[in-house]
C-alpha cells in the first residue's frame, strides 16, 4: 500500500467516525496540502460539503451554519496563511460558544523551519481561542492506528460540543504524495463492531440543587425582574422565561436574540424606558435574575451596573462570568430553561401592581414611538419594527452588529411566536456577517433575512459568492446611510479634534461610496431600492416568495437617523410624564 493510500484510509476512518457522531456539514477551501482532507469530505455522500474560494468566508459561513443548526461543522483548509485567515471566525466562535472542528493541513515536521514554501508555525496558532488543539500525524495504517484515529474523531466531536461549546483544532501533518486514483473502501475499519465509540451525554436538564437554591433566593422577593440576554443555544428558553415571569408577576426584559420577547410579561421598549428621566425612581427591584449573555442595550447594562445593593442571580450552565461590573451576587451553574420551568409551578404572584406598572409604561412608550414613526417614510427604526411584524415565525433574522442589532433591540415588538434572531455578538465584530448569514441559510430551517449596514456589507462582499456558488437563498435588507452610523451616537462625533479637517468622516464614519446594485448584479442577486414603508413591505414579500437571493436597499442619512432616534426617546419621556 502506498503512503498516500494509507493517509486516505486514516483520514477516511476519521471522517467516517465524525459522521457517525452526527456531523452533517463540512466547509472546504482549495489548496494542495489539504487535498486528502478535502477529497475525503467532499466524497462522503452523507455530508453536505460547502466549497468556498477563500478561508475567511469559509470560516464565517461555518460559524453561521453551526449557530443555526446547533451542531459542530467541520472546516478544512490548506497550510500557511490559509489557517491564519480563520482566526476572526475562530475568535467569534470561542466568544459566542459555537462548536467548530478545524482540520488544517500542514507540512510534516521535516519541512518546518527550513524554508519550505507555504509553511508557517501552525501549532496552537489560535492560542486560547481553541478549546483543544491536537497535532495529527498519519504514519502507518495499522488496525491499532485506525482504532486510535476513530477515537480521536469522537473526542474532537465531544470536546467541540459538550460543556462550553467551542473550537477544536486538529492539525494534520501530511506527506506527499497527496493524491490517489480512488478513495479506498472503509468497511468499518478500525471498529470491532458497529457501535459508536462515543456515547454523547444527554442534554442537561433541571438541576434540582440549583432550582432549590434559586427558589430560596427569590422566596421573599416582591418585585423581581428577569433579564434575558442572547442565548442562541437554548431554543426552549424563550417560552420558559415568559411562563416563569407570568407566573410570578415579574417584568421580562428580553433581548430579541434570547427568543424570550414574548408573552404578556415581556417589556418591548425597555431600552427607551430606561433612558427616560425619573422612570427608574419608582421601579427599584428587590432581586434580578439574569440568563444568557450580556444584553445589547447600554441603558439596561448601565442600570444593572448601578444596582450594586440588589441581589443579581445569574443562571449559566457554563458559568461564563459575563459580569464586567462585578455586580452578580450568585452564580448558579444550571440550564436556564429547565430551571425556570421547574419554578413555574412554585411561583406565586406577589405584587400584581409591579408588573402592571411596567406594562402600562411599555404601552405608553409604544404609542410614543409609533407617533414618531407613523408616516410612510422608511427609516432604519421603521425597518426594524416592520421586520418584527412581517417575518414569519419559522424565519431567521441574522442581524449585523453595530446599529442594526441596536435598532432590533429598541424597536422589535413583542410577539407570541417571534422568529429566531441571530447575530455575531461573541466579539461584536462586523466582519464576516454576510458569510455567516449564508451559513445560517444553509441550515435549511426556513427563510433567512440579513439586516446589515453598508460598511458591514462592504467588509464581506466576497461572501455574496455563496448565493450562486452554493445555490443558497438569502434576503439582504441593506441600510445604506453612507458610513458607520453607530459612531454618530458616540462622543467622537462631537470631538473638535475629530471634526477638524473632516477627520471624522474620512477616518471614523468611513462612507464607502459604493453602488451596491452593481455588487448584486455581479453576484447574481436580484436588486431593488425602496423609499417608503408600503414599498418595503411589497419588496420583502417578493423576495421571500422568490427563488434566489435578493437585495433590498434602503437609503438613509446618518444625521437624520440620529435625530429620529432622539425624537423617539424624547417622545417616550414626554409620554411618561
Annotate each predicted stretch with a short phrase:
Residues 104-156, 254-362, 544, 553:
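Glycine-rich, acidic loop regions that bind phosphate or pyrophosphate groups
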Residues 6-92:
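N-terminal cofactor/phosphate-binding cores enriched in small/glycine residues
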Residues 103, 110-123, 407, 412-577:
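Thiamine diphosphate
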Residues 24-28, 48-50, 68-107, 284-292, ...:
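A short, small-residue-rich loop immediately preceding and capping a beta-strand
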Residues 11-14, 19-22, 29-33, 37-38, ...:
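Active-site diphosphate/adenylate-binding microenvironment
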Amino acid at each position: 500500500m502506498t503512503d498516500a493510500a494509507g493517509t486516505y484510509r486514516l483520514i477516511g476512518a476519521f471522517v467516517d467516525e465524525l459522521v457517525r457522531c452526527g456531523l452533517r456539514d463540512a466547509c472546504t477551501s482549495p489548496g494542495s496540502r489539504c487535498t486528502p482532507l478535502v477529497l475525503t469530505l467532499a466524497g462522503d455522500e452523507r455530508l453536505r460539503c460547502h466549497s468556498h474560494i477563500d478561508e475567511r468566508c469559509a470560516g464565517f459561513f461555518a460559524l453561521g451554519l453551526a449557530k443555526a443548526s446547533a451542531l459542530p461543522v467541520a472546516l478544512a483548509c490548506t497550510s500557511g496563511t490559509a489557517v491564519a485567515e480563520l482566526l476572526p471566525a475562530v475568535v467569534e466562535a470561542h466568544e459566542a460558544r459555537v462548536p467548530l472542528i478545524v482540520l488544517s493541513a500542514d507540512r510534516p515536521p521535516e519541512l518546518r523551519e527550513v524554508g519550505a514554501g507555504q509553511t508557517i508555525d501552525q501549532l496552537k496558532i489560535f492560542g486560547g481561542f481553541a478549546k483543544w488543539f491536537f497535532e495529527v500525524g498519519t504514519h502507518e495504517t495499522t488496525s491499532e492506528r485506525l482504532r486510535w484515529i476513530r477515537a480521536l474523531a469522537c473526542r474532537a466531536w465531544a470536546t467541540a460540543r459538550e460543556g462550553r461549546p467551542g473550537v477544536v483544532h486538529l492539525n494534520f501533518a501530511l506527506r506527499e504524495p497527496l493524491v490517489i486514483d480512488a478513495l479506498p473502501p472503509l468497511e468499518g475499519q478500525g471498529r470491532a463492531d458497529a457501535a459508536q465509540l462515543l456515547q454523547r451525554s444527554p442534554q442537561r436538564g433541571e438541576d434540582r440543587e440549583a432550582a432549590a437554591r434559586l427558589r430560596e433566593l427569590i422566596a421573599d422577593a416582591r418585585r423581581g425582574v428577569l433579564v434575558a440576554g442572547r442565548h442562541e443555544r437554548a431554543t426552549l428558553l424563550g417560552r420558559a422565561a415568559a411562563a416563569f415571569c407570568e407566573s410570578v408577576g415579574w417584568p421580562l426584559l428580553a433581548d430579541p436574540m434570547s427568543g424570550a420577547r414574548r408573552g404578556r410579561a415581556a417589556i418591548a421598549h425597555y431600552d427607551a424606558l430606561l433612558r427616560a428621566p425619573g422612570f427608574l425612581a419608582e421601579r427599584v427591584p428587590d432581586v434580578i435574575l439574569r440568563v444568557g449573555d450580556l444584553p445589547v442595550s447600554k441603558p439596561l447594562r448601565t442600570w444593572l451596573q448601578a444596582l450594586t445593593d440588589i441581589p443579581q442571580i445569574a443562571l449559566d450552565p457554563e458559568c461564563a462570568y459575563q459580569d464586567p461590573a462585578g455586580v452578580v451576587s450568585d452564580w448558579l451553574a444550571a440550564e436556564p430553561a429547565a430551571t425556570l420551568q421547574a419554578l413555574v409551578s412554585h411561583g406565586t404572584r406577589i405584587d400584581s401592581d409591579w408588573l402592571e406598572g411596567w406594562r402600562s409604561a411599555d404601552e405608553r412608550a409604544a404609542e410614543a414611538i409609533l407617533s414618531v414613526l407613523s408616516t410612510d417614510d422608511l427609516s432604519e427604526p421603521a425597518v426594524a419594527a416592520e421586520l418584527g411584524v412581517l417575518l414569519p415565525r419559522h424565519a431567521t433574522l441574522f442581524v449585523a452588529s453595530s446599529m442594526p442589532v441596536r435598532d432590533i433591540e429598541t424597536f422589535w415588538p413583542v410577539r407570541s411566536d417571534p422568529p429566531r434572531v441571530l447575530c455575531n455578538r461573541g466579539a461584536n465584530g462586523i466582519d464576516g456577517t454576510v458569510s455567516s448569514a449564508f451559513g445560517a441559510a444553509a441550515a435549511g430551517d426556513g427563510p433567512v433575512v440579513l439586516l446589515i449596514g453598508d460598511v458591514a456589507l462592504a467588509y464581506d462582499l466576497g461572501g455574496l459568492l455563496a448565493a450562486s456558488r452554493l445555490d443558497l437563498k438569502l434576503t439582504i435588507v441593506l441600510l445604506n446611510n453612507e458610513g458607520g452610523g453607530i459612531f454618530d451616537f458616540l462622543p467622537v462625533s462631537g470631538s473638535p479634534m475629530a471634526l477638524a479637517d473632516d477627520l471624522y468622516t474620512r477616518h471614523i464614519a468611513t462612507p464607502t461610496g459604493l453602488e451596491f446594485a452593481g455588487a448584486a448584479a455581479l453576484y447574481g442577486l436580484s436588486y431593488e431600492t425602496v423609499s417608503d414603508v408600503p414599498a418595503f413591505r411589497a419588496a420583502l414579500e417578493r423576495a421571500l416568495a422568490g427563488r434566489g437571493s435578493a437585495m433590498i436597499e434602503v437609503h438613509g442619512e446618518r444625521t437624520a437617523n440620529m435625530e429620529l432616534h432622539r425624537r423617539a426617546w424624547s417622545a417616550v419621556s414626554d409620554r411618561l410624564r
